[in-house]
Amino acid sequence: MTNRKSMLAYAGLAALLFAGPAEAASDEIVIGGALSLTGVQAPLDTPGFKGAQVAVKALNDAGGLLGKKVTFVNIDGKSDPVTVGNVAVELIDKGAQLIIAPCDFDFGGPASREAQAAGLVGISTCASDPLYSSWSLGDKQFTLSMWNTTMGATAADYAFTERGWKTAYVVTDQFIAYTKSLSKYFVEHFKTIGGEIILEDTYTNGDNDFSAQLSRLQALGTKPDVIFISSYGTDIAVMIRALREVGYDAPVLGGDSYDDPAIHEALGEKLGNDIYFVTHTWMGPEAHPDMPKFIDLYKAMYNEDPDTSFVATGWDTVMLMAEAVKMAGTTDGAAVAKALEEGEFKLLTGDLEYQDAAGGHAPDKAAVLVELNAGKPSFLGWRRPASIPNP
């Protein structure tokens, strides 16, 4: 996308954090968050909330934004789409000029719809379904994340091209748009590059019973080279445990929902092996030279190390907003959206460019691969598929 964009200078992390302080001002730039701190969405949104808080403090310590203090107000969306929409309305009524939406289309879409109705830019910390687009939500709405087209293709490329796994068994949780489209794009790309899907099955989040699916798999009389499970929360561990207990020891692949320490703990040292997932970044210097600076700031605020890349998505969302506001010289929704469309952004979660509104605000972004062994994650590196499915 670079050849269709004007090359705009990006000040970068160091400029945001270490530039001289701006002139003091009595007014504020208010960022409103509808991130869910309770419920099923909390393992993704709470880390983002923490990362956003670190970013706001860093901005204010460096003098603020446009000479103004940055204030971040988050109201718990409670993992309920209706509540998320109502929270967004409340935040806008209280003066929010930018909206941070939850990390999912089903849970975050209502916040971005309200932002759009108010003429404000909204950015989801990590929604990856292509429904999180200007096509569905409006010309001022964006997601920080790669789309599932990239996430699914990255997983398929790793399986077939890098590891030589030719056959796959796919389980799709019917929970939300994210889980369904991630499997869709994995399957499409895996077949395109020569892989064979021996069986596709479904699961309903919260069932905690995988026996019917196991019966159908066992009836095939053959074992797959790789197992792709698109699910959410600790149900992922339920399915992996069930498969391992009856002798299916093939490697397991998944998406960014696996980037959850609770899942790693549930699997433990015995079951948390030969598992691979695609996510947003890695919380170490291997992923980005500025990551140690962020980790130090995070530890100073929370007295603990960040343990998931969703922390970095919160930081990056605020810093992305800040850079776009600086470029626009205003928080006006149309101007900030234009800056986001025209900019090239270097983030902890990877370099990012957006297509214009007609192109859905599709994000051009790489992905990170992580391996889980003995219940502990390790960094495999950045990946960018040579081709991806159409959304």
Residue locations for each model-derived region?
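Periplasmic-binding protein-like
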Residues: 91-103, 123-125, 169-172, 222-233, ...
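Extracellular/periplasmic periplasmic-binding protein-like sensory domains
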Residues: 240-315, 377-390
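Segments of small-molecule ligand-sensing domains
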Residues: 300-308, 312, 322-379, 391
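An alpha-beta-alpha
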Residues: 37, 140-205, 321
